[in-house]
Amino acid sequence: MINEIKKDAQERMEKSVEALKNGLSKIRTGRAHPSLLTGISVDYYGAPTPLNQVANVIAEDARTLAITVFDRELTQKVEKAILMSDLGLNPMSAGTIIRVPLPPLTEERRRDLVKIVRGEAEGGRVAVRNIRRDANNDLKALLKDKEISEDDERRAQEEIQKLTDAAVKKIDDVLAAKEKELMEV
């Protein structure tokens, strides 16, 4: 009983940390990275299709992404999709290869991005605390139904608190790394 609650809480906390990492990877830093364009969909014969299924995206250098479109007719649609995204990027086409230069981030934009990143991290911490609360409520329900003793409940709550502290520390580490990456010029 108790082990199931702890295992469930741990899995959910790890998923929260992973979700935060994925969310932060989409926030643009000064460096070019193919994952910047993962959220972009292209209209492919009437169906929205992820960019990585119709083109190959690579980092050409620190400030340029190169996109090789598989189907020549899609080149303009890919360009349009990148322009329409809210990433503020200006693609330049050369045959089937589209180059996307990344403008350098201004100090003000970096600070805004750090605020956004901190907000995302706080959302992750709140999610982890909610998972802790749910697990503790499950333990209290077991105690109320006299399925576990008070000592077992207290011990389990302490272990869940340790899991929570570990997850929050992971979130803080991810946040610190992303802030450092954003503030590098």
From Swiss-Prot:
<dbReference type="Pfam" id="PF01765">
    <property type="entry name" value="RRF"/>
</dbReference>
<keyword id="KW-0648">Protein biosynthesis</keyword>
<dbReference type="GO" id="GO:0043023">
    <property type="term" value="F:ribosomal large subunit binding"/>
</dbReference>
<protein>
    <recommendedName>
        <fullName>Ribosome-recycling factor</fullName>
    </recommendedName>
</protein>
<dbReference type="InterPro" id="IPR036191">
    <property type="entry name" value="RRF_sf"/>
</dbReference>
<dbReference type="GO" id="GO:0006412">
    <property type="term" value="P:translation"/>
</dbReference>
<comment type="function">
    <text>Responsible for the release of ribosomes from messenger RNA at the termination of protein biosynthesis. May increase the efficiency of translation by recycling ribosomes from one round of translation to another.</text>
</comment>
<dbReference type="GO" id="GO:0005737">
    <property type="term" value="C:cytoplasm"/>
</dbReference>
<comment type="similarity">
    <text>Belongs to the RRF family.</text>
</comment>
<keyword id="KW-0963">Cytoplasm</keyword>
<dbReference type="InterPro" id="IPR002661">
    <property type="entry name" value="Ribosome_recyc_fac"/>
</dbReference>
<dbReference type="InterPro" id="IPR023584">
    <property type="entry name" value="Ribosome_recyc_fac_dom"/>
</dbReference>
<dbReference type="GO" id="GO:0002184">
    <property type="term" value="P:cytoplasmic translational termination"/>
</dbReference>
<dbReference type="GO" id="GO:0005829">
    <property type="term" value="C:cytosol"/>
</dbReference>
